[in-house]
Design a protein with these regions (language model features):
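Class I SAM-dependent methyltransferase Rossmann-like catalytic core
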Residues: 29-67
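Conserved class I S-adenosyl-L-methionine
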Residues: 70-79
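Conserved SAM-binding loop of SAM-dependent methyltransferases across substrates and taxa
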Residues: 80-93
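Conserved SAM-binding motif I beta-strand of class I
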Residues: 96-101
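S-adenosyl-L-methionine
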Residues: 106-136
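A short glycine-rich, Lys/Arg-flanked "PGG" loop and its adjoining helix->strand segment in the class I
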Residues: 159-171
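Conserved beta-strand signature within the Rossmann-like core of class I S-adenosyl-L-methionine
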Residues: 171-179
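Core SAM-dependent methyltransferase catalytic element
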Residues: 200-226
Length: 226
């Protein structure tokens, strides 16, 4: 049974609840950050960060999503679901969000946090996305949003996953990735043929949002030969 914070407050202090609410919410956010920090230390290779994404980073990421074109959105490595919340706010009521996550703790956290019929959680690695897409009946993806720490993974695996993203994207669709270093910019440019960058300083640590569009074969050929 879900008990609201308001219902647990004695009647004598209900009148000052509005002034207490920021403190209560601040405590909840602190607990979430501590939870993320502990889990990240245990699984730093798969999480890639010791702090959840700031609201400034989340907003920069979802600005790359056109809600009118976002019918199928795939999130890779959502962590504890901070970016997930912003994606669900951004996309329309008929859109679908598919999430790939391998960490059991984060999956349970996301399931407990969100009750949204548009969202499907897939407990598997992103490298196996093709099998799941074919099973579900997905023909193409409009947007990939990735928080996978590719800089900590073997380059061959990174290329395999990003090439799969490219093959499943519709022409004009986007792959959106955030990182904390520019080490893999050359790889994304090589795979997608283009990229745009946005630096988000108000994050711990400062982050880079990378956006790559799937070009038409003709445009891709022009870039390859330029």
């Amino acid at each position: 049974m879900r008990i609201s914070v308001r219902a647990t407050i004695p009647p004598l202090i209900k009148g000052i609840y509005p002034s207490l609410r920021p403190l209560i919410l601040g405590h909840q956010q602190l607990q979430q950050r501590i939870h993320f920090f502990r889990e990240s230390l245990r699984n730093l290779r798969s999480t890639g960060s010791i702090a959840p994404s700031s609201r400034f980073l989340c907003r920069a990421i979802v600005r790359k999503i056109d809600p009118h074109k976002a019918k199928v959105v795939v999130e890779l490595g959502p962590g504890n679901g901070v970016v997930t919340r912003y994606i669900l706010r951004r996309i329309g009521p008929s859109a679908r969000l598919y999430i790939f996550e391998i960490n059991d703790v984060f999956i349970e956290k996301i399931r407990a946090t969100f009750n949204d019929p548009r969202m499907t959680i897939i407990h598997d690695s992103a490298e196996n996305m093709g099998n799941h897409f074919r099973e579900i009946g997905i023909e193409e993806v409009d947007y990939f949003v990735s928080g996978i720490p590719f800089v900590m993974l073997p380059e061959l695996l990174t290329e395999q996953i990003t090439n799969q993203c490219l093959s499943w994207l519709r022409v004009g669709g986007r792959f959106v990735q955030f990182h904390y270093s520019p080490l893999l910019l050359g790889l994304y440019r090589r795979v997608f043929g283009n990229l745009k960058l946005e630096v988000v300083a108000l994050n711990i640590p400062p982050a880079i949002v990378i956006s790559c569009e799937k070009l038409s074969p003709a445009n891709q050929s022009l870039i390859s030969h330029s």
